[in-house]
A protein has these predicted regions:
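Von Willebrand factor
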Residues: 76, 87-121, 158, 164
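Negatively charged sequence features
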Residues: 1-31
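…and closely analogous acidic/polar surface helices at protein-protein or active-site interfaces
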Residues: 31, 36-68, 72
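Short acidic, S/G/P-rich loop/turn micro-motifs used as interaction or catalytic elements
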Residues: 42-44, 73, 130-133, 160
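Von Willebrand factor type A / integrin I
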Residues: 142-200
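Short beta-strand-loop
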Residues: 68-90
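DG-centered beta-turn motif at the end of beta-strands
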Residues: 8, 36-40, 121-133, 177
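Charged helix-capping and loop-helix junction motifs
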Residues: 51, 136-142
Length: 200
């Protein structure tokens, strides 16, 4: 069985190409993944890391659907599946980069994909939850949580910054099954392995 966490961790330094697949003995059913990635200016320092994660995850877990946003959200699964990693990241940033509005993004996600979220779906949000004082639409986040197997929020900011300034993270984490700081490969691998091992 493919060890997805280790493979993704190893793939990111090689531009998302899983040259060194790792295998585990325990058979596990692969979950359906929907990943929502913030590519706004406030996460500019981490945007490539987050998009590399999407690129590698989609490569090793074919049932992954990927979405990107700053305000308006759109699906980027085809871009990540068909283009070289650097070109895919450039296209995503060009199309979806800008000022952040999580409420708008969650509304768009609800219209595009909420009907397909069910007890077999893990939804991952990658972003800093900084929302420019706009309405974060916690109601929509709660609706996603109620439908999904897991709702996981990965924040590239240190936990000591959560809730400071325009960060909505302290409110957001109450609507998630799991909320974690994620700014390096080791943290990322732990979360991915949890996604695969958790049988709620």
């Amino acid at each position: 069985k493919l060890h997805v966490g280790e493979t993704v961790r190893r793939a990111i330094p090689t531009d998302g190409i899983p040259f060194h697949p790792r295998w585990r003995k325990i058979e596990r059913k692969r979950p359906q993944i929907m990943a929502i990635c913030d590519v706004s200016g406030s996460v500019a320092a981490y945007a490539k890391f987050l998009l590399m994660f999407l690129y590698a995850l989609q490569d090793v877990l074919p049932r992954t659907r990927s979405f990107a946003f700053s305000a308006a959200l759109g699906e980027v699964s085809d871009l990540l599946a068909t283009l070289p990693v650097e070109e895919a990241i450039e296209r995503v940033n060009l199309k979806y980069g800008g000022a952040t509005d999580y409420g708008r993004a969650l509304q768009d996600f609800s219209e595009l994909a909420l009907a397909e979220v069910n007890s077999a779906t893990t939804v991952i949000v990658l972003g800093d939850a900084r929302n420019n004082q706009a309405d974060p639409r916690l109601d929509l986040l709660g609706e996603i949580k109620s439908r999904a197997r897991q709702l996981i929020w990965l924040n590239p900011e240190s936990t000591r910054l959560w809730g400071t300034g325009d960060s909505e993270m302290l409110l957001v984490k109450k609507e998630c099954h799991l909320a974690k700081e994620c700014q390096n490969l080791k943290q990322l691998e732990r979360v991915i392995d949890k996604i695969l091992s958790d049988r709620r």
